[in-house]
């Protein structure tokens, strides 16, 4: 009976994202798998800032990884049956777009539209800002956010992501546990069925293995 009540009451989760990430696009298109279990709050961050804070780099910044990663994205879109188109260049700066999403306190409808503009339409918002704003349901003359409070909000979101254990996107945080990557939806679902998972000996050991280098 207790398990039934737990299943019937979604718990809170935070989803950190940046529209630069095709894997975040693939994730949000599958988030319905979690809808009955987690009330997910989309939270925009600046991925470049998170990378700097965690001494990390994205595959798009590593020449040897780019072809493999991008071709894998094409395959995954086909596998998932999702429309998908790369922008003419990638990566690109997403500061203005992420600030706008933070400023608007964007919920899922707007977040999905932002991702679709990049990964379905294949466009860089910086090159067609008025059109991007209209695509989100905003006025074409919406300015690129420059207010100190908006800048501070995006920075704060990014800092909170790091504090929550994120080092990349997409990352879903549940109960203080960070699940990174489009391939961790099943892991998150298993955790919800087995919330003591991270207290088990094997997980405790795996989380503390020292480096041999």
Located regions from the model:
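Structural alpha/beta surface segment adjacent to cysteine/selenocysteine redox centers
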Residues: 19, 23-118, 202-212
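N-proximal short alpha-helices
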Residues: 4, 42, 46, 158-161
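Non-catalytic pre-domain segments flanking phosphatase-related domains
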Residues: 1-8
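C-terminal cap of thioredoxin/glutaredoxin-like
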Residues: 9-14, 20, 24-38, 113-213
């Amino acid at each position: 009976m207790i398990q039934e009540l737990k299943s019937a009451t979604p718990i809170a989760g935070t989803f950190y994202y940046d529209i630069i990430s095709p894997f975040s696009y693939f994730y949000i298109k599958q988030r319905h798998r979690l809808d009955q279990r987690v009330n997910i709050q989309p939270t925009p961050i600046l991925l470049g800032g998170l990378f700097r804070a965690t001494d990390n780099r994205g595959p798009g910044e590593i020449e040897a990884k780019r072809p493999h990663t991008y071709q894998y994205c094409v395959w995954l879109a086909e596998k998932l049956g999702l429309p998908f188109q790369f922008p003419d260049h990638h990566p690109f700066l997403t500061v203005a777009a992420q600030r706008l999403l933070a400023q608007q306190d964007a919920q899922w409808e707007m977040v999905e539209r932002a991702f679709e503009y990049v990964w379905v339409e294949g466009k860089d918002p910086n090159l067609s800002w008025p059109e991007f704003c209209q695509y989100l349901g905003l006025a074409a003359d919406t300015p690129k956010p420059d207010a100190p409070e908006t800048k501070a909000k995006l920075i704060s979101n990014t800092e909170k992501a790091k504090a929550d254990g994120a080092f990349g996107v997409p990352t879903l945080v549940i109960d203080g546990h960070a699940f990174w990557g489009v391939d961790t939806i099943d892991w998150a679902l298993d955790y919800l069925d087995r919330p003591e998972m991270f207290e088990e000996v094997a997980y405790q050991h795996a989380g503390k293995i020292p480096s041999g280098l």
